[in-house]
A protein has these predicted regions:
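Extended, highly charged accessory segments
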Residues: 8-11, 31-33, 86-260, 265-275, ...
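Amphipathic alpha-helical
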Residues: 1-4
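Acidic, glycine-rich flexible loop/linker segments
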Residues: 46-101
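Conserved catalytic micro-motifs used in adenylation/nucleotidyl-transfer and phosphoryl/amide-
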Residues: 12-51
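Secondary-structure transition/capping motifs at alpha-helix termini
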Residues: 280-290, 315-324
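Short glycine/threonine-rich loop-to-helix capping motif typified by GTGT followed
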Residues: 299-310
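Conserved structural-core and active-site-/substrate-pathway-adjacent residues in large, well-folded domains
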Residues: 36, 77-78, 294, 313
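Short, ordered loop/turn segments at secondary-structure junctions
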Residues: 83, 295-297
Length: 324
């Protein structure tokens, strides 16, 4: 379990659906995605031949020649060492990998679990001038009554999310929030359907934020220097804790993503450029957690859309070689 927790910091879950066959010249093997949504069957003969394919019968063998046959289970792996002439099964492979390093010790020593932290600081949740804020950030009555209130009060999926036949924002002559200009270009489906609650064995909302250490190819405890979030939505208290973490190696800075409305489009460009430069300078100053905040919105300042601000800072730091 610690092995998987460690590697979940460094890579996304492999959902597939896919069956993967691989070889480096010495080792050859097959692996199935963790949901098992693709068939993968194997046959091992008595004369030391192994066939892995999506269907049985890709190669014809006399039944008396077959030593073993079966199918790869979800997330399982089958490996051949051609030098040793040995077959390694899933349990043996993963046991070796899990025991190669003290993953549990690394996690316990370095990882911070945000949901377990407590703060004596009082955090104010009230919002002044709520109606004005709703207008500034593009929230309408339909968003509030049909989406936010049902989700917040009943914890249920809003029916408002089941379809959207409104005109494209780019063709509208009405003011639109920045997010409305982006649409997924294809319909993403799973077959069979996956439910995040009933399928919680293979699904998670857990997120990690922080600086990657030595990387996935060099297992090291520096990769565990992360904050684990139980889900991507933070309360005001959790955000306050995050920006006031005082553990060794965790340094946080808050940058404002706002611009002067009087300067119009030019002011937005200037503020965005300045925000990117501040982020790069913060990295040089030793900060490894950057919080972008639009809490400074008032009569003379508007928010830089979060999608625009985050993507701009992200790519600016990558181009500068500071995003790790």
């Amino acid at each position: 379990k610690a092995f998987y927790e460690y590697h979940s910091i460094l890579m996304e879950p492999w959902d597939g659906p896919a069956a993967l066959l691989f070889s480096d010249g010495r080792y050859a093997g097959g692996m199935l995605d963790r949901n098992g949504l693709r068939p993968a069957r194997y046959t091992i003969t008595k004369n030391d031949m192994m066939v892995v394919a999506s269907e049985v019968g890709v190669m014809d063998f006399d039944p008396t020649e077959i030593a073993e046959k079966g199918r790869l289970q979800p997330g399982k792996i089958l490996l051949i060492d051609t030098q040793e002439g040995k077959i390694y099964y899933d349990g043996e492979i993963k046991e070796r990998l899990a025991e190669a390093h003290p993953y549990r010790k690394w996690l316990n020593t370095n990882r911070i679990e945000l949901e377990k932290l407590r703060s004596g600081r009082k955090v104010e949740n009230a919002v002044e001038n709520l109606t004005r804020k709703e207008l500034e950030f593009g929230f309408g009555a339909e968003d509030i009554d049909g989406t936010i209130i049902p989700m917040a009060t009943k914890g249920q999926e809003p029916t408002a999310s089941m379809g959207n036949d409104t005109p494209l924002a780019v063709l509208s002559d009405q003011p639109q929030i920045f997010f409305n200009y982006f649409r997924q270009q294809f319909a993403q489906v799973t077959n069979p359907a996956i439910d995040s609650i009933r399928e919680n064995l293979v699904m998670s909302l857990t997120e990690y934020i922080g600086r990657v250490g030595s990387g996935i190819l060099n297992p090291d405890e520096s990769n565990c220097k992360m904050v684990r979030l139980p889900h991507p939505i933070l309360t005001n208290t959790q955000l306050d804790i995050l920006q006031n973490i005082r553990y060794k190696g965790f340094n946080t800075v808050k940058l404002h993503m706002i611009f002067e409305t009087a300067k119009g489009e030019e002011g937005l460009h200037e503020a965005l450029d300045e925000l990117c430069k501040q982020a790069a300078q913060s990295v040089d100053d030793g900060y490894n957690y950057i919080i972008l905040s639009d809490r400074g919105v008032d009569e003379t300042h508007a928010a830089i859309p979060s999608l625009l601000a985050v993507s701009a800072v992200h790519h600016y730091l990558i181009d500068a070689g500071k995003r790790v």
